[in-house]
Amino acid sequence: MKEGQYPPYKASGMAYISFARRQPQLFKVLFMRDRTGEPQPAEDELTRRIIGLIMKNTGLEEQAAYTLHIELWIFIHGIASMLVTGYLNLEETVISTMVTDVYQGLLARKKEETA
């Protein structure tokens, strides 16, 4: 993955997947452990900032932006988890297309719901 290859929001997800591919054992330790008792994403300052940027860039209301982000993050984490467990072995270009398709589909649905 090259710097500037993707828009910033997509780049964060693609970097997460790239990290999983490059460092599968570390990824498992960091992101595939019991998280019981940890703050939920809605309580996290970084998540709140991301939601603000999504709202600004898409025109979505706060709840729709939050749901969009969480749905996308679950999708991204799912791909990364499937890569590190050997369940999937997809090329970056295929993953990029999938991420774009899901983002565009979710965004269109959120905008339709709030229209």
Would you name each region that the model predicts?
Residues L26-V29, R33, I74-E91, G105-T114:
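Amphipathic C-terminal alpha-helical segment
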Residues K2, R33-T36, T58-E61, L88:
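A short, mixed-charge helix-start or loop-turn motif at secondary-structure junctions
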Residues M1-R22, E62, L72:
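Hydrophobic alpha-helical connector segments
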Residues A15-Y16, Q23, L68, L83, ...:
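Short alpha-helical scaffold segments that flank and stabilize functional sites
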Residues S18-Q25, R48, G52, I74-G78:
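Generic structural signal for well-ordered, non-membrane alpha-helices
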Residues Q5, Y16, L26-F27, L46, ...:
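Hydrophobic side chains within well-formed alpha-helices
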Residues G4, R48-R49, T85-N89:
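Juxtamembrane/interface motifs at transmembrane-helix termini
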Residues R35-G59, Y66-I70, S96-K111:
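Amphipathic alpha-helical packing segments from all-alpha helical-bundle domains
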